[in-house]
C-alpha cells in the first residue's frame, strides 16, 4: 500500500525527469543492500529509503535551488497511506538531507523530537546513500551501470562502473563543472 500511495502522490507532481528519479532510487537501494550488514539496518529502513528516493526531487515544484528543504516539507505533509507518523518524519528528513546534512533543518522540523538518537543516525546514513546516488547522476545521463560496495575493517569502498557512451558522459560532466 505504501509504495502505491507514494507513486500516486508522485504522479500528481509536475516533475519531468522520471528516469533520474528511478535511477537515483535504484543506485541508493543498491548501496543500501550491499552495506546493509555493516549498518545493521532493518527492512523497513530500506522501504523508507525507497520512498525517499522517489520523493527526493518533489520540492522542485516549489523552488529548484532549495528543493531538498521543500521536498522534506512536501513529504512531511503529504497524504500518504501505509506508514506511521514517525516513518513519515524519517522519510522527510532523508529527502531533506539528500544534498548534505543540515543541523539547521533538523532543528527547524519540530517533529524530530519524536525520534531517537539511533533513528537520527539512520537518517544520516540513508541520506548519505541518497546523496551519493544523486551525485552519481548529477548530469541526469544515467552513466553509471553498477556500483560495487565493499568494506574492510577500516574503510568503505565503492567501485563505480560506467555504461554506454562512457566517455561522452564523462566529458559532459567535466564540461559542466
Feature-to-residue mapping (PLM):
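Divalent metal-dependent catalytic cores for phosphoryl transfer on phosphate-bearing substrates
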Residues: 6-11, 20, 29-149
Amino acid at each position: 500500500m505504501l509504495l502505491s500511495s507514494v507513486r500516486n502522490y508522485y504522479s500528481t507532481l509536475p516533475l519531468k525527469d522520471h528516469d533520474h528519479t528511478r535511477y537515483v532510487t535504484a543506485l541508493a537501494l543498491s548501496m543500501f543492500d550491499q552495506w546493509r550488514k555493516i549498518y545493521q539496518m532493518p527492512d523497513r529502513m530500506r522501504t523508507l529509503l525507497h520512498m525517499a528516493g522517489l520523493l527526493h526531487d518533489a520540492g522542485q515544484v516549489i523552488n529548484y535551488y532549495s528543493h531538498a528543504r521543500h521536498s522534506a516539507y512536501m513529504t512531511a505533509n503529504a497524504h500518504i497511506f501505509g506508514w506511521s507518523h514517525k516513518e513519515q518524519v524519517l522519510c522527510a528528513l532523508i529527502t531533506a538531507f539528500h544534498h548534505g546534512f543540515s543541523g539547521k533543518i533538523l532543528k527547524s522540523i519540530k517533529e524530530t523530537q519524536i525520534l531517537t538518537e539511533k533513528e537520527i543516525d539512520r537518517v544520516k546514513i540513508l541520506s548519505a546513500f541518497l546523496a551519493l546516488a544523486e551525485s552519481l547522476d548529477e548530469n541526469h545521463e544515467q552513466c553509471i551501470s553498477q556500483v560495487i560496495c565493499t568494506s574492510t575493517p577500516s574503510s568503505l569502498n565503492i567501485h563505480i562502473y560506467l555504461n554506454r557512451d562512457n566517455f561522452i558522459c564523462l566529458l559532459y560532466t567535466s564540461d559542466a563543472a
